[in-house]
Every structure is written in structure tokens, then in C-alpha cells.
């Protein structure tokens, strides 16, 4: 049997081209993910720097000023130090749970960013159940904290892990009920659709005016989910040394540090998306840019402006969260649980029932 060499070469060339297409497709698929991770990292560094500057201003002292101009590189210096510190393991602890816990806490929060729309065309995954995916994924983080507390074989760590789980359950329910109210108003669970519904009437179409009670409950619950003062009971220094972080050092301790700020950023982003119109702005900025001859119809211009508006609103709430941390004292554990179960839960449930009633009457 005579084999045609021309056909063999054609087949080999075709297979190589198909393999090249698969590689290019894989790279093209990873580019948005890597871009999002890079943007999240930069956002965390900015939050750390802002918190140090704001806290220094509130306490009337000088903040970081040596590492870079205005101390902007201080967070990078601290992260580098933690990266090269020794990773100490507890001798009688569960090493597997101890090592897996920080990773679960960070990964579950990073996955939440996949459904956040920074602009109409700038979202990693436009899912029909976007807000529920965020709630479901963020509920995994307390499991990692509980694993860390149990795996440390330390009474302070275990108490901190139990507090983190109890606090998360207490405030996850009111937060979910507030999200359900927003979904009923928008007739959708997609984050893109929720923002688009708010764009019809400018600033007066924001869910802030349609759900003022839900906004307050959501804001308090999101702060409690981030375990920030006055809700930082799981890592209260005076009672539990450092809570579930007590036995950690090096990069694993740094992961908890990063997870805290990642959670704060994602909560502020969802406040912007759900209640403050996302990338929409009532000010007619397009006419202002038109005076300078800037092409307003291009997709790049719209995406850039949408991302800028979203981040501007987000960092406003970050400022409020940071100022709250350095202003209010810590609550007791019984006060924290009573606030969640006896106050926020009935209010959020009543808000959901009222929203459902109004939606049924409007049909």
C-alpha cells in the first residue's frame, strides 16, 4: 500500500493547527481570570494603605511614610515579610485541617468576584443566579475558619472558630433576605439585570430609595460578615489572643489577612451593585466629555467610565467601613447574637413580606 506523503503532511499540518488553536483558546480563557486576580490584588493593597492613612488621621498620628511615597508600598513590604517567614505547625494539631483552612477562606471569597459587574461588558460570568452564587460561595468561608480553629489544637483558636461560624450563620440569613427583596423588585437574580433595572430613572431609580430598611440591614450584616469592628468577636485580642489565627505564622497568617480585606471589598462592591446603581451615574458626564471631542460611543470609553464609577462608589463604602472600625467599640457576644437573631432577622423578614405584597399588588 502506497501512502501519499502530501496527505500525511496535510494531516500533520491540520493537527498542529488544531493544537495551536486549543492552546490559544486556553490562554484567551485564562486572560480574564488573571486580569481579575491582578485587579483584586491591587485593590487589596489600596484598601490596606487607605485604612492605615484613615486610622492615622482619626487617631491624630502619622501613618506609614517610609516605604515608598506616602507609605504606599508598606503593604507590599509587609506581604513580602510574611512570605519569607517560617511556617510553624502545631505539634499536636491536625496538620491537614490547619493547612487547608486558610486556602478555603480565600478561595471562597475570590470566587465571589466572578459575578460582580464592574461595567455592562466587564463581568467574568453573567449568570442567571449571580447573587445566589455569591451567597452560596461566601457561606463556605466560615467552614475554613472552623477547620483552622479545630486544627490548631488551641482553646483560643477553637473558640474563635466557633464564634466565626455562629456569627456567620446569624448574619447570613438577614443578608440573604435583603438580597431576595432586591431580586423581587428586579425580577431577576442576575447582577447585570439588577443594575439595569436601577438605570431607568437615574438616581431616583436606585434601590436605596426603594429599599431603605433593607439597605441598612444589608450594610450591618455585611460588616458582621467581614468580622470588622464592632463585630470582630472571633479574633478579639483581649479575650482570644488572635482567635482562629493564634497558631498561624508566615504566608498562612497572611492569607487570613488578605481574606479579611477581600471580603470587605466584595461586600462594598455588592452594596454598590444592589443598592447604588452599579456603573450608572445620574450626572450627564457624556455631554461633558463630548465638549472635548471624546468618542462616547466606543465600547472602551463606556467600559472604562463604568468601572471608574463602580469603584468610586465602592471606595466610598470602604471609607465608611474603615471609619466605623476606628470609631465604635466592640460588642459582647450576646449583644452580637441578639442583634442578628432578635432585631435584624425580624426586620429583614418583614421587609421581604412587604416587598412581596407590593409586587403582587402591582401585577
Swiss-Prot record:
Domain of life: Eukaryota
Membrane topology: Multi-pass membrane protein
Catalyzed reactions per annotation: a plastoquinone + NADH + (n+1) H(+)(in) = a plastoquinol + NAD(+) + n H(+)(out); a plastoquinone + NADPH + (n+1) H(+)(in) = a plastoquinol + NADP(+) + n H(+)(out)
Signal peptide bounds: none
Name recorded for this polypeptide: NAD(P)H-quinone oxidoreductase subunit 1, chloroplastic
EC number, UniProt record: 7.1.1.-
Transmembrane segments: 30-50, 104-124, 127-147, 253-273, 300-320, 343-363
A Pfam family: NADHdh
Protein family: Belongs to the complex I subunit 1 family.
UniProt xrefs under InterPro entries: NADH_UbQ_OxRdtase_su1/FPO, NADH_UbQ_OxRdtase_su1_CS
Role, per record: NDH shuttles electrons from NAD(P)H:plastoquinone, via FMN and iron-sulfur (Fe-S) centers, to quinones in the photosynthetic chain and possibly in a chloroplast respiratory chain. The immediate electron acceptor for the enzyme in this species is believed to be plastoquinone. Couples the redox reaction to proton translocation, and thus conserves the redox energy in a proton gradient.
Organism: Piper cenocladum
Gene Ontology process terms (BP): aerobic respiration; photosynthesis, light reaction
Molecular function as annotated in GO: NADH dehydrogenase activity; oxidoreductase activity, acting on NAD(P)H, quinone or similar compound as acceptor; quinone binding
Keywords: Chloroplast, Membrane, NAD, NADP, Plastid, Plastoquinone, Quinone, Thylakoid, Translocase, Transmembrane, Transmembrane helix
A single cellular component GO annotation: chloroplast thylakoid membrane
Subunit composition and interactions: NDH is composed of at least 16 different subunits, 5 of which are encoded in the nucleus.
Localization (cell): Plastid, Chloroplast thylakoid membrane
Family annotation (PANTHER family): NADH DEHYDROGENASE SUBUNIT 1, NADH-UBIQUINONE OXIDOREDUCTASE CHAIN 1
Amino acid at each position: 500500500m502506497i501512502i501519499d506523503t502530501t496527505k500525511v503532511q496535510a494531516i500533520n499540518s491540520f493537527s498542529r493547527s488544531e493544537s495551536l488553536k486549543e492552546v490559544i483558546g486556553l490562554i484567551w480563557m485564562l486572560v480574564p481570570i488573571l486580569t481579575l486576580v491582578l485587579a483584586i490584588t491591587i485593590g487589596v493593597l489600596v484598601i490596606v494603605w487607605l485604612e492605615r492613612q484613615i486610622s492615622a488621621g482619626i487617631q491624630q498620628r502619622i501613618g506609614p511614610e517610609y516605604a515608598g511615597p506616602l507609605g504606599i508600598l508598606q503593604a507590599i513590604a509587609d506581604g513580602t515579610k510574611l512570605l519569607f517567614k517560617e511556617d510553624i505547625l502545631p505539634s499536636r494539631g491536625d496538620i491537614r485541617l490547619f493547612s487547608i483552612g486558610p486556602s478555603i477562606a480565600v478561595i471562597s471569597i475570590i470566587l465571589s468576584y466572578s459575578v460582580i459587574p464592574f461595567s455592562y461588558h466587564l463581568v467574568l460570568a453573567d449568570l442567571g443566579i449571580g447573587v445566589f452564587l455569591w451567597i452560596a460561595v461566601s457561606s463556605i468561608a466560615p467552614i475554613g475558619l472552623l477547620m483552622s480553629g479545630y486544627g490548631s489544637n488551641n482553646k483560643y483558636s477553637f473558640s474563635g472558630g466557633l464564634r466565626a461560624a455562629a456569627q456567620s450563620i446569624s448574619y447570613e440569613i438577614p443578608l440573604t433576605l435583603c438580597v431576595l427583596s432586591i431580586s423581587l423588585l428586579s425580577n431577576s437574580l442576575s447582577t447585570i439585570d439588577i443594575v439595569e433595572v436601577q438605570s431607568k430613572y437615574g438616581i431616583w431609580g436606585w434601590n436605596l430609595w426603594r429599599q431603605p430598611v433593607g439597605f441598612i440591614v444589608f450594610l450591618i450584616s455585611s460588616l458582621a460578615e467581614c468580622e470588622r469592628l464592632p463585630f470582630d468577636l472571633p479574633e478579639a485580642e483581649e479575650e482570644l489572643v488572635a482567635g482562629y489565627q493564634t497558631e498561624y505564622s508566615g504566608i498562612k497568617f497572611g492569607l487570613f489577612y488578605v481574606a479579611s480585606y477581600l471580603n470587605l471589598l466584595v461586600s462594598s462592591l455588592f452594596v454598590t451593585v444592589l443598592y447604588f446603581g452599579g456603573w450608572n451615574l445620574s450626572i450627564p458626564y457624556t455631554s461633558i466629555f463630548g465638549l472635548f471631542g471624546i468618542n462616547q460611543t466606543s465600547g472602551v470609553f463606556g467600559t472604562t467610565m463604568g468601572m471608574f464609577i463602580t469603584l468610586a462608589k465602592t471606595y466610598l463604602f470602604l471609607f465608611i467601613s474603615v471609619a466605623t472600625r476606628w470609631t465604635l467599640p466592640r460588642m459582647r457576644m450576646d449583644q452580637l447574637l441578639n442583634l442578628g437573631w432578635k432585631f435584624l432577622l425580624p426586620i429583614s423578614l418583614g421587609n421581604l413580606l412587604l416587598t412581596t405584597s407590593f409586587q403582587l399588588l402591582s401585577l
